Curated annotation (Swiss-Prot):
Quaternary organization: Interacts with paxt-1 (via N-terminus); the interaction is direct and results in stabilization of xrn-2 in the complex.
Region forming the signal peptide: none
Region (Disordered): 424-443, 505-532, 804-975
Annotated organism of origin: Caenorhabditis elegans
CDD domains listed in its UniProt record: PIN_XRN1-2-like
Zinc finger (CCHC-type): 262-279
UniProt protein name: 5'-3' exoribonuclease 2 homolog
Subcellular location: Nucleus
Function statement: Possesses 5'->3' exoribonuclease activity. Plays a role in maintenance of steady-state concentration and turnover of microRNAs (miRNA) by degradation of mature miRNA. Degradation role is enhanced when in complex with paxt-1. Partially redundant to xrn-1 in miRNA guide strand degradation. Implicated in differential regulation of mRNAs such as let-7 by controlling the accumulation of mature miRNA. Positively regulates molting of the pharyngeal cuticle.
Amino acid sequence: MGVPAFFRWLTKKYPATVVNANEDRQRDQDGNRVPVDCTQPNPNFQEFDNLYLDMNGIIHPCTHPEDRPAPKNEDEMFALIFEYIDRIYSIVRPRRLLYMAIDGVAPRAKMNQQRSRRFRASKEMAEKEASIEEQRNRLMAEGIAVPPKKKEEAHFDSNCITPGTPFMARLADALRYYIHDRVTNDASWANIEIILSDANVPGEGEHKIMDYVRKQRGNPAHDPNTVHCLCGADADLIMLGIATHEANFNIIREEFVPNQPRACDLCGQYGHELKECRGAENETDLGDDYCKPEQREKNFIFLRIPVLREYLEKELSMPNLPFKFDVERALDDWVFLCFFVGNDFLPHLPSLEIREGAIDRLIKLYKEMVYQMKGYLTKDGIPELDRVEMIMKGLGRVEDEIFKRRQQDEERFQENQRNKKARMQMYGGGGRGGRGRGRGRGQQPAFVPTHGILAPMAAPMHHSGESTRQMASEARQTAMKFTNDANETAAANLKALLNVKGEESPADIASRKRKAEQPLIKPEEEEDEGPKDDIRLYESGWKDRYYRAKFDVGSDDIEFRHRVAWAYVEGLCWVLRYYYQGCASWDWYFPYHYAPFASDFETVGEFQPDFTRPTKPFNPLEQLMSVFPAASKQHLPVEWQKLMIQDDSPIIDLYPADFRIDLNGKKYAWQGVALLPFVDETRLLATLQSVYPTLTAEEKQRNTRGPNRIFIGRNHKSFEFFQQVAESKSDDLVPLDPTLLNGVSGKIAYDSTATAPGLPFVSPVNHDECQDLPTNCGICVLYEDPEYPQDYIFPALRLDGAKEPEKTLKPDDWNDRRDGRYQPQVGFNRNAPRGSLDQSGHRQVHHYVRGGGGGGGGYRGNSYDDRRGGGGGGGGYNDRQDFGRNYGGRDGGGPQRYHDQQQQRQGGYQGGGYGGGYGGGGGGGGGGGGGSYHQPYNQDQRRGGRGGGGGPPGYQRPPYRGGGGGGYHGNSSWR
């Protein structure tokens, strides 16, 4: 499922799950890095035992960032990766284990998604380069200077972040150096274990981590109260965290900041898009919006799985169940239901969209059907398909209604967009992409002079950053239609545009009148209504149209529909086992591009999936041949590249130069379905046998399935044991003693590629911060997880001895009078210190902040006399020297002052009851607040009025404090 969509839904519905991460500064005021002492207590008031890094979520933003200039070379990339790990480490400060997992060869089900992503990336890059070249040629034809083309080798192909490429091999070497450097030079690394699972170890990074956690949990030496922290941004990490059933599991990730500014692809400057680019011209005089935005380190946040469990336990609780309620089983069912909405291995059902509340709909249906099912949907990662069929039948009965409601919502949205655009054009805000901004009613429009090439253009008198960007963007697009001879004139007009003071000439007024007579929305400016919808799920016959368009069969082919539904259910069984037991089959995949309908699951209770056939993962180079487009062939051996481009290649059909993207009811191409041919595994592997003999020794090494490695420092209590294993130079696996390794179980063996302790370690990274180690103080050996029988089932339950974390949410039976005022928990620890002011601090605040805030807009009735306090009042002012000058600030005003001048002249009371009662008129101390309805002013009782808080009467003594709270009568007073 989409990461932003799911995370936005989750944090909106369960807000207490997220807390901001506290961290010590790693840079001083001059931007220089300063070391952080990670041996000190954790700044988040929560100590963590194990830190797991899903490394691909770190590698991608460090190698091709979207919010800053890209690194110049690989060495800078590696240095940024090290810096990123250091920052995460300094926030979490693990006390036992650091686990780094890089994506290895994935199961076939995941490879299909990887193939789609990489082919899309190649297609988008080609289209982007064509657009850049087209814009470059257009500017050069106008005689405008353009930046030189980037060198071919300067382009970083992000597809190289795939197992088996030379880049990933060099990255693994760099990470080994990084670990040795830290255990040698950083005291906080001295007593922990570090496990590195590089790209030669099969499996996705997050699932290699989950395999490790599952196998450690099955060992008696495991501490059931281990505090885990997993770093990664994928949405499925949340489900994986719940699936562990660990008592203390947390996720750390970057805070998602939408709408980040991006540099122009041609000139590298900010503030405009490629189509608006004017080449290498100096744009710094266009304001701050066109300069490079301030580079700010992104904040990190924690998502606390124990708090999410609290929410879900409340939500999934059901009264009068015909069986005993088990919260662990209910949580597993919740994870399973989320798979229907989206996952990396199956397309989501057409009737389920997360933005339409699909998960809530499924949970509601689940709670209704559980009384008929008389049991849970899943157990230990294996679904009960007869109960799944009941849920799907229930969803199928309302599919028609869901599709109709979706269409109604879309029509309503389009109508609102048209109305919004009309309003924006009416008030001169422009109509481009919803970026314009209407002006207030009391503000008259201003127009720039009509000389030169710029047409009259509405401009807000008070320029905001958004309006300035909009005006400058429109001016640029106008200027692009003219030749270089008009550049100076365009610049002068643009400068006049930005410096406009608001004067209008008679010609401007006439122009404005002519424009007012024109239609609000011109036909050529109407919003793109999106692709034509031929399926029309909201009309009768939708199922037949869907199957004919997507599968080229009619809906009357019942057998085919059931076959697709059975394949989908087989996929659900595979995904659930993948999350709870590990990979059930390396070669299974869903063989269709589209999902069936919920109403087609009518016979899935009869289906029995079979994953008993032994399978094995692809080799790294074989995976590259499965997921790479021909445009990324440079990462493959030379002879293997030819199979992707030569016309006589037996597998040339697997690498189409172009392919169709079915928008499938969506608006943007990235949301559509890439109709790529599925890889024929048998034909691919047979063809590759002819080029295997051409591999060099280095290429053969990259093509092997490798082991995990474990590192410790010289001061670790297991150092001598590790050294004995290393000096034996034996390939035999030796069991670990968990008591000497913080509870870690498994086996180790000699690593022939490791640098022995005491020897120099030459840095593979040519960077100032990556110096050679004169004396290596770390040791590395091969590591293997604990082994279990082939048919072993890992139980999905809370371990004995696990202590429940302290509850974060307010108890349902909390009584403020009986139990005291409830204090919400902020962060991990309810007893964490909170910021507060002493008496001197409060005095200083009252000294400098003496005026009240402005009141909100008041109630406006239909009659003329009821327009009381429509506008927000200004902040009041108290003259401490002369209490007679105790002004209420600006009164609410609104469209017209209240007609009763007698009440208005009661000096100072505007900030009190009058401002509060009529909503406006800030002043006195607290301000009028947002008055919501007319309320007569009571001079004798001096009440604050209805609103956000009535300010004090004008004659009160300092310090002034507003009285009335929102929505009730509050007596103003001072203390």
